[in-house]
Amino acid sequence: MTPAPKSSFVLGHRHLLGIEGLSAADISGLLDLSEEYVELNRQVDKKRTSLRGRTQVNLFFEASTRTQSSFEIAGKRLGADVMNMSVSSSSMRKGETLMDTAVTLNAMHPDILVVRHHASGAVELLARKVDGSVINAGDGAHEHPTQALLDALTIRRNKGRIEGLTVAICGDVMHSRVARSNILLLGIMGARVRVVAPSTLLPPGIERMGVEVARDMREGLNGADIVMMLRLQRERMNGSFVPSSQEYFQYFGLDQKKLAYANPDALVMHPGPMNRGVEIDSAVADGAQSLIREQVEMGVAVRMAVLEALARNLPNA
């Protein structure tokens, strides 16, 4: 059994529905606790008992590999009883509403619900109907808070800070919940954020979020410390937003030539899954400046920290 983390941080919120509403102190506290779990997860014995006796339900209405498996591993390492609910075989496939599903699950007294849904705002609605804590694992194009937290942890571990860095977020900003959560978090933590995309993939009024806007990669990557690539979210697109994948890669795909526009020590990130040859070239994704595999490792640590920080607020904790 691994030793308990030294951090006693408690998240002062019942749920984690988004980055919006978190303070810099909340974010720093979660990142500090996550740092401890990074080291604990590298030990042979990774088990903890902080969620022993607690029930964690992973309720995913959208397909997921990284996020769902990461939350499952995180919960089990903390000692929780983890249940993955298959929506394909659930009552919702038979016509039950989201709210009825929430009421039904609540009657089983889960302590923590981890929810992903294709509709923006659906997770917040569900949270109103349950007694336990709810973690948003991604809702439509709205938010994906744990992805932004793991990205922040990855940046902080490699750059030593977040404040003052220039972060270029490139690609399908319009349909990306990852972009929105990262813009919010990086702004709270004092980074300079620039979004880089063709006009068709920029949400109207994005400047109101306090970001700079660039419509070509040379301008967008100039002076960047971090280059964060986003995939084309075709499942959320109604119509054509780019002429073709090949033309998109020509102008907005990250290859070695375009990466040279950024600072020499710039680092590359991607939330996954990647579309190689569309938004990123394999030579960059697998190259020395890539943090993409490290992001996956940080995901487990961050989700353990979030689960523990919320569990410390639960009754009888």
Swiss-Prot record:
PROSITE patterns, from UniProt?
CARBAMOYLTRANSFERASE
Identify the residues that bind carbamoyl phosphate: 66-67, 116, 144, 147, 272-273
Q: Under what name is this protein listed?
A: Aspartate carbamoyltransferase catalytic subunit
Q: Which GO terms describe its biological process?
A: 'de novo' pyrimidine nucleobase biosynthetic process; 'de novo' UMP biosynthetic process; amino acid metabolic process
Q: Does the keyword Transferase apply?
A: yes
Q: What function does the entry list? A: Catalyzes the condensation of carbamoyl phosphate and aspartate to form carbamoyl aspartate and inorganic phosphate, the committed step in the de novo pyrimidine nucleotide biosynthesis pathway.
Summary of subunit composition and partner proteins: Heterododecamer (2C3:3R2) of six catalytic PyrB chains organized as two trimers (C3), and six regulatory PyrI chains organized as three dimers (R2).
User: What keywords appear on the UniProt entry?
Assistant: Pyrimidine biosynthesis, Transferase
SUPFAM superfamilies assigned to the protein according to its UniProt record, in alphabetical order = Aspartate/ornithine carbamoyltransferase
Top-level EC class as recorded in UniProt: transferase
Q: Reaction catalysed by this chain? A: carbamoyl phosphate + L-aspartate = N-carbamoyl-L-aspartate + phosphate + H(+)
Q: Which NCBIfam families match?
A: asp_carb_tr, PRK00856.1
Record flagged with keyword rRNA-binding: no
GO MF annotation list: amino acid binding; aspartate carbamoyltransferase activity
- Provide the residue positions that the database annotates as binding L-aspartate: 94, 177, 231
Listed GO CC annotations: cytosol
Q: Which gene encodes it?
A: pyrB
Q: Which family does it belong to?
A: Belongs to the aspartate/ornithine carbamoyltransferase superfamily. ATCase family.
Task: Give its E.C. classification number.
Answer: 2.1.3.2
The source's superkingdom equals Bacteria
The annotated pathway is: Pyrimidine metabolism; UMP biosynthesis via de novo pathway; (S)-dihydroorotate from bicarbonate: step 2/3
Which Cys pairs are S-S linked? none
